[in-house]
Amino acid sequence: MNYQFTIPQSFPQMTVKELLEDYFLIPRKIRHFLRTKKHVLVNGETINWQSPVQKGDQIQLIFDADDYPEKELPSGDPSLVEELYQDEHVIIVNKPEGMKTHANEPTEIALLNHVSSYVGSTCYVVHRLDKETSGAILFAKNPFILPILNRILEAVSYTHL
């Protein structure tokens, strides 16, 4: 999978390494894959990680599926999913009371199974809600966005009501 974006005009000066580590919060393991495979391109060319990115630069990140093997999940029922929001990276659904977020046993069916069937590919639990709790729950639609979302959620404080 490839991701491309353009450095905006209002972007602060930083290196490729700082861009991936501090701005996009890409974890060390994923940065390692990107660096060793030379899968970070700036304006179509590989670049030294200490090189600065410039306003208007085209950044391309290439992720190999082999680095992120998909888990096999039993199929769920997509009609049980109430979608609240979805984009290319995440899906947010309403978890009903009485349904587990994820299974404890390999053959058990839970919300994760239903969401994965709804999306058409394996999704990943970003956070969970207790079985008896209903509410919005976030799933990552690919394995390389999951640790980024986890790092963002770690920085957020919240209060149980």
Regions found by a protein language model. Give the residues of each.
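RNA pseudouridine synthases
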Residues: 1-161
